[in-house]
Every structure is written in C-alpha cells, then in structure tokens.
Design a protein with these regions (language model features):
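A short, sequence-level motif marking secondary-structure junctions
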Residues: 24-26, 69
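Hydrophobic beta-strand residues in large extracellular and virion-surface proteins
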Residues: 4, 24, 32, 36, ...
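Short, mixed-charge low-complexity intrinsically disordered segments
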Residues: 41-69
Length: 69
C-alpha cells in the first residue's frame, strides 16, 4: 500500500504544504504513480485555486518518489 500526497511548493522533495492525501491500496509502484499523476492533473484542472504543484507517492517504509521534477 502507498500514500499519495498532492503538494504545493517549488519541488516534490521539499513541499511547502501537503494539500491533500489518500491511500492507494496496491502493491504496484507503477499503478500508484499513474494514479498520482492522474489525480494531480485532474486537481490542477478542476480546482486550480488549491495551488497543487506536485505529487508524492510514499511507501509504508517512508520511501518517497514524486514529480513532476
């Protein structure tokens, strides 16, 4: 299972704020990243006032990957 976070800031590694988050119940990092990218684009399109700039996918052990760069 992974946690997907939508963040605001200059980079996904050091977000200024976590805007929203949700759990992604999959064992596939590729599936979690695909869901995160889709959620990011949809949020930017449908709720631009939220100021979302990046996504992060965090594993149960705390390892994070994200984007866009």
């Amino acid at each position: 299972m992974f946690r997907i976070e939508l963040t605001r800031g200059s980079s996904w590694q050091e977000p200024v704020e976590t805007i929203d988050h949700r759990d992604c119940e999959t064992n596939s990092i590729d599936a979690a990243v695909a869901e995160a990218k889709y959620w990011l684009v949809q949020t930017q399109k449908n709720a631009p006032a939220r100021g979302v700039t990046h996504y992060r996918v965090v594993s149960e052990n705390g390892t994070a990957i994200g984007g866009p760069p």
